[in-house]
């Protein structure tokens, strides 16, 4: 491995991460209780009044809040629709997340495409500019069909939750070459027909493999391409 690649890997490890894992067959309160026990804090409570989405939360030893929320896109009984939303994580937290997922699976949690489950990966957008985000959009547009094939995404999910880069967005993006994030946001929302409610969580523009709505509202670059399956390990 040459020095340049080694440096790139080390820089990647400095990025912040947020993960949303959809599952069913486990109640949100039970998942939060299990997480609190796993973290060794025993602290979990109903936080729906603050977070909405029928949320139960658990706290780890660092005081970070891990949320278990209802997501209507998940199949199954309402009380067992459960989406784990992590706090801001770092590279060294990946093993912690993996072990928590194992605990949830052993407690009965199920997650696969037949249950309407997916994974959303958020990477901190710090350091990105309109230029780097334009580059990323072009790279994604050139490779997302390969990604979809590799991840075996079904056509229904792609048409609803994991849409490819809108060609109108890409055309305007490359024509105007925005110099500010505000100008980039204008192109994003207008091209996706979602100029209304730009600050709304469920703005329709979010349902793309490459989701820049998260960039403008949460400061992350979000990928919606991943199907979810809790595997044996």
What are these regions (language model features)?
Residues 120-124:
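Midchain, well-structured core segments that form catalytic/ion-binding scaffolds
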């Amino acid at each position: 491995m040459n020095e340049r690649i080694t440096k790139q890997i080390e820089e990647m490890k400095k990025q912040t991460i947020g993960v949303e894992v959809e599952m069913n067959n486990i109640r949100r309160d039970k998942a939060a209780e299990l997480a609190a026990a796993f973290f060794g804090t025993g602290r979990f409570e109903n936080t729906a009044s603050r977070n909405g989405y029928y949320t139960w939360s658990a706290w780890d030893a660092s005081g970070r809040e891990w949320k278990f929320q209802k997501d209507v896109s998940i199949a199954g009984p309402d009380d067992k629709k459960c989406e784990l939303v992590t706090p801001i994580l770092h590279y060294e937290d990946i093993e912690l997340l993996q072990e928590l997922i194992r605990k949830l699976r052993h407690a009965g949690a199920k997650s696969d495409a037949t249950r309407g489950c997916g994974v959303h990966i958020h990477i901190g957008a710090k350091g990105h500019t309109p230029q780097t985000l334009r580059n990323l959009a072009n790279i994604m547009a050139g490779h997302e069909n390969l990604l979809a094939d590799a991840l075996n995404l079904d056509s229904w999910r792609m048409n609803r939750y994991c849409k490819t880069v809108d060609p109108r967005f890409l055309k305007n993006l490359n024509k105007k070459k925005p110099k500010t994030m505000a100008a980039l946001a204008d192109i994003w929302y207008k091209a996706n027909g979602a100029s209304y409610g730009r600050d709304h969580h469920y703005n329709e523009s979010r349902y793309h493999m490459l989701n820049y709505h998260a960039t403008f509202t949460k400061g992350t670059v979000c990928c919606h391409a991943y199907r979810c399956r809790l595997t044996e390990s």
